[in-house]
Amino acid sequence: DPLGSTEEFSR
């Protein structure tokens, strides 16, 4: 999901 993707990008 989008939230999970943003987490990855945040790291």
UniProtKB/Swiss-Prot annotation:
Superkingdom of this protein's organism: Eukaryota
A single Gene Ontology CC term: extracellular region
Keyword annotations of the record: Cell wall, Secreted
Subcellular location: Secreted, Cell wall
Record carries keyword Secreted: yes
Principal cellular location given in the protein's record: secreted
Protein name: Unknown protein 2
Species of provenance: Ephedra distachya (Joint-fir)
